[in-house]
Amino acid sequence: ILIFLSIFLLNSVLAFGSYIDTDAKTAVVIDGTTGKVLFEKNKDEKTFPASMTKIMTTLIVFEKLSNGTLSLDDTFLVSERAWKEREGSSMFVEVDKNIRVEDLLRGIIVQSGNDACIVVAENIAGTEESFAKMMNEKAIDIGMTNTNFTNSTGMHDKNNFSTAYDLAILSQYLINNYPEYYHMFAETEFEWSNIKQKNRNPLLYKNMGVDGLKTGHLSVSGYGLAASAIDGDRRVISVTNGFSSTQKRSQGSSRLITWSFREFENIRLFEDFTCLLYTSPSPRD
């Protein structure tokens, strides 16, 4: 008896063939389903991810929510160190207060709060340094071969680095494995401590199907953005870094996404029939 499994194999193919370039120093666009690279510019060049680091920070939390070791209603205590973290963006947590994991996630994803990242890191791993080790273990596990994390926030450290391609791998993994939590990345505002902040992802406010991920900026590496968009049944993921301004980041990233949807399409190449079981017929008497 032969049992076959029919597998539909997809491939992203160039439909029209127009050329595009970008002012970003490093960039990549991948198909969200197949992982195929649709565009690249220095995609494996080391860069400082800045707040795009927080994609991995949230991934660690999502993983623990998914396996049941955490719940959204669990609370984390704010340490003095986390409370004092006011460099860069902040959720404005208060020392010695207990904050729900769900609120901290929104503080990280929507408000890009460095303080919220430290609260999460310390409560999950004891110290931010130990949390960074967890981040690196996960990076290796999902195939990020040119990445090293030293903190949960993306604050500049010469040893906190990644590549556009590795960040695309990270983004694809998070989206595909944790759809029940990924929707938080599409939220456009969050209020905490009577301070309402808007999501820093500029493409969420454009009518182009973008539904999440993170911006990043450091003076040493410029402006970056990991963004994902849906058009019908297709998803693309764009990661750029090294733009000289927020305006160029927004325009450049949106151009790459629009181009990828216009110039590529997924087609079924063939059906692969895989033999699962073979049983020899019984001999006749």
For each feature predicted by the language model, list its residue ranges.
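A generic local structural motif
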Residues: 14-15, 224
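Generic signature of intrinsically disordered, low-complexity, basic-rich segments
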Residues: 11-13, 135, 249
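Generic marker of residues within folded, mature protein domains
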Residues: 7, 39, 66-68, 219, ...
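Domain-terminus/edge residues, biased toward the C-terminal soluble/receptor-binding domains
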Residues: 144-148, 156-161, 165-280, 284
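Sterically constrained small-residue positions within well-ordered secondary structures
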Residues: 6, 18-20, 229
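Bacterial N-terminal signal peptides
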Residues: 2-11
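Active-site-adjacent loops and short helices of periplasmic peptidoglycan-processing enzymes
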Residues: 15-165, 172-176
